[in-house]
């Protein structure tokens, strides 16, 4: 899934924060329960990869790719797997099906992979070219100069008192260097990389300091004739009040507040949420969440206003009602502001943390009572931050939760209890959503023979769906056919809209460029995000490990968008590696896909027995 394909930028791994389970137990030895018996599904053939008529076919890297690395993997196929095959004079092993994968050195400039296949009719030759940028070198020492392309910051900055910022340039080595905002004093720069001549100066905006917006001026050397350069970014500091940013509506229904302009995601405000905006870095706007806590949003995703009143939500009364699935907690607010939900590791409590808010809750009403929620408490955690804690009754635990603004400014937290499970048939009656990753417009990774990940994912999902039907479950597929186009954000949304009880996203792996595919054993990985999904991830991981079909790369926490689905236990499974010839060959075998499906369903059964309400049906 991680392989970078020129035609497919499929954002399956968005980073962020939220209810992260402790990963301390991952990797420790533990007894695995016996796998439940699962009847085999009918074998469904995978659409075979296209067979090239050429003696040698390169699949990766693409022609003309630009790559900054010292080594790169190369894969494709040959017409005769028994013939001697070499790339740049190095013998390359070929799988019996004709696929090959090599890890080879590359050098700067236009680099050519020259492949030779010794056929009985003569030697077949094929070439694949890429460009490797040369390593950075210093400027000549015999002349004072500044590299204008190196001047940083490269994007406009809007700063406030207390903000730290950095000016940087590349210039002749070992010389005095200075920088200034036009009209301001010159400030010395320090040479932080003497080998390349990289200079930096770090600043903090002083209280009441104002300047700009204007580009920085840089100088190398001393005296009036010393070379100078002017940056392209405009930098400013202001004492004006912050703007108000209002989240725009989008396809996902939420925005991603990041830890830095290019950092990981941390909070996900819904459309209409208002925040103070008190800084800017290029196309990113800094928003204030609470005392000492800020994040960054894409400027295009918010409406900015300098005339609106700042967000100050008041938290009113709280109501708790029983629902068929569990309970619903409604928190009255005077306006929409950002919030986050954090569940504890024991899965018996959740905290709704509301930003830009003041608590004024006099009543917590249990309407008709609740056998699921025990108590609701609130406190002013910090100035502008209210924490509402929902604790379940003893012995109860979360199966999932969903938080949203209901209509206007009322915040609704739906809590889901575990479904009833029949010990003899633990999956009977459960809706299991299978998400075959990728689609025709974003096909994912590709194998040496040309097998597309999206097709392998779908074939595994079909095999698992048939097994689930035999177990009495109702399988739901996010992609109903191999040609369906389903966006990434629509996949977890389907789980909510179609009433799924579990969500499993099925993938097969690739590797980022410059990563040695032979550096360690590679095989399956299971990913989870929320604490209430850890048990599902562990059960499926253990079932795959017991089946021992490919090497085990572990159970991992990861901030993947589909795994962040909170309404039900949700995981993502990387079944095998598309780019490894032997694993691509296995994925093209119906019997192997059947074994994967058997392991998956066995893990789901064990999870249902462990986490579900296992009272016997009448």
Q: What are these language model-derived features?
A:
Residues 505, 512-515, 525-527, 554-618:
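Active-site-adjacent mobile loop/cap segments within catalytic or ligand-binding domains
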Residues 9-17:
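Bacterial N-terminal signal peptides
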Residues 23-43, 51-56, 75-78, 95-97, ...:
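Signal-peptide-cleaved, periplasmic/extracellular N-terminal interaction regions immediately downstream
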Residues 333-334, 435-438, 477-482, 505-510, ...:
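Active-site-proximal beta-strand/loop segments in catalytic clefts of secreted hydrolases
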Residues 414-494, 498-502, 512-515, 520-522:
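Active-site histidine-acidic residue metal-binding/catalytic motifs
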Residues 60-63, 89, 153-155:
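Surface-exposed, proline-enriched loop/turn segments that connect beta strands in immunoglobulin-like
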Residues 531-556, 566:
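Active-site-adjacent substrate-binding region
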């Amino acid at each position: 899934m991680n392989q970078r394909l020129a035609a497919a930028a499929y954002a399956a791994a968005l980073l962020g924060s939220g209810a992260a389970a402790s990963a301390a137990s991952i990797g420790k030895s533990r007894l695995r329960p016996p796998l439940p018996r699962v009847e085999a599904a009918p074998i469904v053939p995978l659409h075979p990869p296209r067979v090239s008529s050429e003696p040698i076919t390169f699949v990766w890297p693409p022609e003309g790719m630009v790559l900054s690395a010292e080594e790169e993997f190369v894969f494709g196929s040959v017409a005769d797997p028994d013939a001697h095959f070499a790339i740049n004079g190095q013998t390359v092993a070929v799988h019996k099906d004709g696929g090959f994968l090599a890890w080879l050195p590359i050098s700067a400039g236009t680099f050519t992979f020259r492949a030779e296949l010794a056929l009985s009719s003569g030697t077949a030759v094929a070439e694949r070219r890429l460009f490797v940028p040369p390593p950075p070198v210093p400027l000549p020492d015999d002349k004072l100069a500044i590299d204008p392309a190196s001047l940083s910051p490269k994007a406009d900055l809007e700063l406030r008192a207390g903000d730290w910022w950095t000016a940087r340039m590349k210039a002749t080595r070992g010389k005095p260097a200075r920088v200034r905002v036009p009209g301001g004093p010159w400030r010395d720069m320090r040479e932080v990389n003497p080998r390349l001549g990289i200079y930096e100066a770090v600043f903090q905006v002083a209280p009441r300091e104002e300047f700009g917006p204007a580009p920085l001026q840089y100088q190398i050397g001393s005296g009036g004739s010393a070379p100078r350069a002017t940056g392209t970014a405009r930098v400013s500091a202001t004492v004006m009040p912050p703007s108000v940013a209002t989240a725009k509506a989008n396809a996902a229904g939420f925005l991603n507040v990041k830890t830095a302009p290019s950092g990981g995601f941390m909070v996900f405000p819904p459309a209409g949420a208002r925040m103070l905006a008190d800084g800017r870095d290029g196309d990113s706007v800094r928003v204030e969440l609470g005392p000492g806590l800020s994040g960054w949003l894409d400027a295009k995703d918010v409406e900015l206003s300098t005339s609106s009143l700042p967000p100050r939500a008041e938290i009113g009364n709280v109501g708790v009602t029983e629902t068929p699935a569990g309970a619903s907690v409604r928190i009255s607010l005077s306006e929409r502001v950002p919030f986050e939900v954090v569940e504890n590791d024991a899965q018996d409590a959740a905290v709704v943390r509301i930003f830009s808010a003041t608590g004024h809750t006099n009543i917590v009403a249990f309407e008709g009572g609740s056998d699921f929620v025990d108590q609701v408490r609130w406190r002013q955690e910090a100035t502008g931050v209210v924490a509402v804690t929902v604790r379940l009754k003893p012995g109860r635990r979360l199966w999932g939760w969903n938080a949203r603004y209901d209509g206007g400014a009322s915040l609704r937290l739906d809590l889901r209890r575990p479904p009833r499970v029949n010990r003899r048939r633990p999956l009977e009656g459960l809706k299991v959503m299978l998400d075959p990753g990728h689609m025709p417009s974003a096909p994912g990774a590709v194998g040496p023979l040309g097998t597309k990940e999206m097709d392998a994912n779908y074939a595994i999902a079909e095999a698992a769906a048939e097994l689930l039907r035999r177990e009495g479950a109702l399988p739901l597929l996010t992609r109903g056919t191999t040609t369906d186009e389903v966006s990434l954000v629509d996949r977890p949304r389907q789980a909510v809209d179609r009433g799924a009880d579990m969500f499993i996203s099925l993938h097969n792996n690739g590797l980022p460029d410059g990563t040695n595919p032979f550096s360690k054993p590679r095989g399956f990985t299971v990913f989870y995000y929320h604490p209430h999904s850890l048990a599902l991830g562990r059960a499926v991981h253990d079932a795959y490990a017991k089946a021992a079909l490919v090497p085990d790369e572990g159970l991992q926490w990861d901030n993947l968008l589909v795994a962040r689905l909170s309404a039900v236990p949700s995981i993502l499974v990387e079944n095998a590696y598309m780019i490894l010839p032997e694993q691509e060959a296995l994925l093209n075998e119906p019997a192997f896909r059947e074994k994967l499906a058997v392991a998956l369903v066995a893990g789901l059964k064990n999870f249902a027995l462990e986490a579900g309400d296992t009272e016997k049906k009448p």
